[in-house]
Amino acid sequence: MPKIHELASVLADQIAAGEVVERPASVVKELVENAIDAHSTQIDITVEEAGLQRIVVVDDGDGIADEDSEMAFKRHATSKITDRRDLFRIKSLGFRGEALPSIASVADVTLITSTGGVGTEIHNVGGIIQEHKAAEARKGTTVIVKELFGNVPARLKYLKSPATELARITDIVNRLALSYPTVAFSLVHNGRELTRTTGRGDLQQVIAGIYGVQSARKMVAISGQNPDFRVSGYVSLPELTRASRQYISLLLNGRYIHNFQLSKALIAGYGSKLMVGRYPLAVLDIQMDPLLVDVNVHPTKQEVRISQEAELTQLIQETVFKRLSQENLIPDVFDEVQTKQPETKTTDQLTMALNDVSAKYDMSDRQVLGAQQMPSESVAQPSDAAPVATSMGQPAPLQTPEEVPVEPVVVHDKRDFATPAVQRFDAKYRQEQVAAPLGQSAASAAVDQPAVEATAPIEPVQATPAQRFPTLRYLGQVHGTYLLAEADDGLYLVDQHAAQERVNYEFYRQAIGEVSDDEQKLLVPIVLDYPTTDVLELTNHLETLASVGIHLDSFGPNSFIVHEHPTWFKAGQETATIQEMIDWVLKDGKISVAAFREKTAIMMSCKRAIKANHHLDDQQARALLQKLATAENPFNCPHGRPVLVHFTDQDLEKLFKRIQDPHHSGDDWEEA
């Protein structure tokens, strides 16, 4: 008797279901995607007991003809592709023909469908059709799934708690709603409505319905394109962040995908505007020719392979960076407080006005780019779019300008570099600090007026209009840590450490952030030992390391020797710096000298910035504000913390009860 035999179709379906149907959320995803492919405009999802007891998906799509209804339950039966060439131009969400038979093999499934005439009802249990009959039904399809995994109870023990499984279902529906704002979605669990969208095509209104109105108001529209890709959507301002990447939705030709490199590019677009360990909210819609993407990678179709991915990541990073550069990134104090308050979602969120950047998301123009139809003219897009400073000890009080020449308001440490080239630039920096306090450049110091006496009138600090930075008038210092200033639109509180850190960072980034060929010969070479696997990997990247000044020569089977290093390496830390860059290569397979030097600039800017409890005189404080106003990004320190916060006039009036509370009766209100 032969040992190799063909599996029964029902058993084969159950095996395939292990990849397609992992949990109740997988069932919801597959059924809703089928409804979208059927051109539905209204999709209603009802689940009971987190989907384990019952899942119902109702749509108003094209429906299934009676003659095709049984075929829909067969493996690899689909209407979405016909031949091999279609695999390279997939425009639908589904195409493998596995979803319905996989679901039916592990559940009790009822299909009710109609194309507009007499409907059809099919009852399938465990992959076997039990009944096929005519039924009264409106145009569209209803799929009822009961007793999921009832015939494979071993699968149940791998599921999480009902709350976790329900959260996964909600997440899937929310992602699909963000992908298709022209489709009205509703999700109901045990009689309680969890999600509802209007299907009006306004992406920002969908964001408001999912994440809340306050979050939607802090998101801005982005748009960018190149010959192969078109990017649009919404990203949050740096003040609105979350603790994980899960609030980043990447949509590729209408399909929600997971792609670490694209998420990384989006985050890189924020630069130093994000705090460490914080991530933005974003909905990024990417349109491209289907020829440039392979979605036939995994049965869930959430992992894809993208051709020319490097060009796409660059486009995303540049688009986000340019858009955020146009925004005023000063957080409002009361907005920060309000976002921490519990927010009760109501259906009013779906229709209320958000702000001027709210725009209709024209899905009629959201076409998949074809090889012969690349973007050339118009592009469908959304239109119009205090940290607690750690005390480092009480420093000696600063002397006044009348006693001695103004000293730089920096922490004077020992020389950080030992090489002559860097000593020259470091000396130049210190001279500029003496001539222009708190990092003022020689160019700006040359055009400034003579030093202001302590008794002179306080002049407004002129800001750069392009940065939308306010014109600040210095008022005083609070606890040797914060500078108080006023502007025409209210009161500003400036973190002096973060402010000088930003000023120093931009100086160092320009001074040492450019690649140089200067190298320092070592009297005693550095020997580095690595495992054989790392040595073999490093041999593939010797040219890359050499391009940034790290020349590794073989020194035995498991060692390298280094005879020289770039002059900008910090004295005493040459070995650690080289090892860090080598580890970077081993981890990522590539290295960016510009990014590494930027990290160095961030480190030095923090070390040389004034700390908390460091009292400044009026001249030094005004000099710091003046320099901050000319910074490229005056709103955040290099680590992403805010440099200043804003109290509007209305905020101040609320604090002193000069504005009537809308919930307070006005009969006994006294107007000041």
From Swiss-Prot:
Keyword DNA repair in annotation: yes
Biological processes per GO annotation: mismatch repair
One GO cellular component, as annotated: mismatch repair complex
UniProt-listed CDD domains: HATPase_MutL-MLH-PMS-like (cd16926), MutL_Trans (cd00782)
Superkingdom, taxonomy of origin: Bacteria
Any GO molecular function: mismatched DNA binding
Region (Disordered) location: 371-403
Keyword rRNA-binding listed: no
Pfam families the record matches: DNA_mis_repair, HATPase_c_3, MutL_C
Keywords of this entry: DNA damage, DNA repair
Matches recorded under InterPro entries: DNA_mismatch_repair_CS, DNA_mismatch_repair_MutL, DNA_mismatch_S5_2-like, HATPase_C_sf, MutL/Mlh/PMS, MutL/Mlh/Pms-like, MutL_C, MutL_C_dimsub
Family: Belongs to the DNA mismatch repair MutL/HexB family.
Role: This protein is involved in the repair of mismatches in DNA. It is required for dam-dependent methyl-directed DNA mismatch repair. May act as a 'molecular matchmaker', a protein that promotes the formation of a stable complex between two or more DNA-binding proteins in an ATP-dependent manner without itself being part of a final effector complex.
Name of the protein in its database record: DNA mismatch repair protein MutL
